[in-house]
Amino acid sequence: MTQWRIDTPQSLDLEGVRRLNVRIVAGSIDVVGSTEATSTGGAHIEVSQLEGALTVTLEGDTLTIAHERLTWGGLLDWVGNMGNHKASAVVSVSVPDGCPVELGVVSADAVVSGITADTKVKSVSGSVTLDGVNADISAQTVSGDLETRHLEGQLRFTTVSGDLTVVDGSSSRVKAETVSGDITLDLDVAPGARLDLNSVSGDVTLRLPESASLQIEAKTMSGSLDSAFAGVTRDAKPGRSTLRGNVGSGDGLLQAKTVSGDVTILRRDSA
């Protein structure tokens, strides 16, 4: 194991990196997948702003960049003690695009792009953007928003009040759960896809191509339900409304449930 203590802005080049773990407080983190150093596992770290030391560790093929004493399981503990921890960082990291990423942020914004391996995200209050991540994603936030662009893979997302936005995505499996956050998906769905979308008071909006093939089951207690697809009908009763029907041959499944949030299913016409 090799370890460096970073207490001033600087850059660092490493080789043999096949996995990345990042945990920072405040500031921002930008992770970019590169195809240029795949064979050597080359990684480049650029720290441009810093308050509170960072520890950089290369153990085997795992690169870890973290504020001192900040653990993956202890992210929430920092929220109540932010005044006692003077820490922030602006960091950019380039790693091989096939490098799995585990990212934890507290009051920091994060961007991950060009990664083709599984990506795991935990955010307390920072916003997270995943661009061109062509692999499975697992994301958990408290109040942070998650936006994905050009998603190709399965997505699992849980939050209290953060919003989920998927733009220009393609997936066979999406599972999203929120309390008050909104869920907005613009998605191509693979044959046999399964989408499970649950919210208490947040709205669920889904735009599907007209060629989609899904069985639709949407329920709400007091929100509104609406679908742009023929063959999907609404049944409204006191305290419960449902939206059911098939789009195409119905070989996939969309289940959406809310308490007071609205559910809207839009159709994207062919060009």
Please give the residue ranges for each predicted region:
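Intrinsically disordered, low-complexity terminal regions
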Residues: 1-271
